[in-house]
Amino acid sequence: MSEIKVGENETLESALRRFKKKCARAGVLSEVRKREHYEKPSVKKKKKSEAARKRKFK
């Protein structure tokens, strides 16, 4: 889990902004979305191969 230390003269808005940025860099939200529903291994493999195909033809 991402943690930040709030400075003495730091506003809540700026601390929240730093926290959100740190979470985004750590990939927390994307991980939550990915794990929201169970995905069968065959579906994972299919998505992975489709993504590779898209990257190849770009």
From Swiss-Prot:
Q: Which InterPro entries match?
A: Ribosomal_bS21 (IPR001911), Ribosomal_bS21_CS (IPR018278), Ribosomal_bS21_sf (IPR038380)
What ranges does the record give for the region Disordered, renumbered to this chain?
Answer: 35-58
Cite the record's Basic residues compositional bias ranges: 43-58
**What keywords does the record list, in alphabetical order?**
Ribonucleoprotein, Ribosomal protein
The family annotation for this protein states: Belongs to the bacterial ribosomal protein bS21 family.
- A cellular component annotation (GO) from this entry: ribosome
Record-linked PANTHER family: MITOCHONDRIAL 28S RIBOSOMAL PROTEIN S21, SMALL RIBOSOMAL SUBUNIT PROTEIN BS21
Q: Which gene encodes it?
A: rpsU
GO BP terms, alphabetized: translation
Q: Which Gene3D superfamilies match?
A: Ribosomal protein S8
Source superkingdom:
Bacteria
Gene source species: Clostridium botulinum (strain Eklund 17B / Type B)
Mention one GO molecular function. Answer: structural constituent of ribosome
Q: What is this protein called?
A: Small ribosomal subunit protein bS21
Q: Do the record's keywords include Chloroplast?
A: no
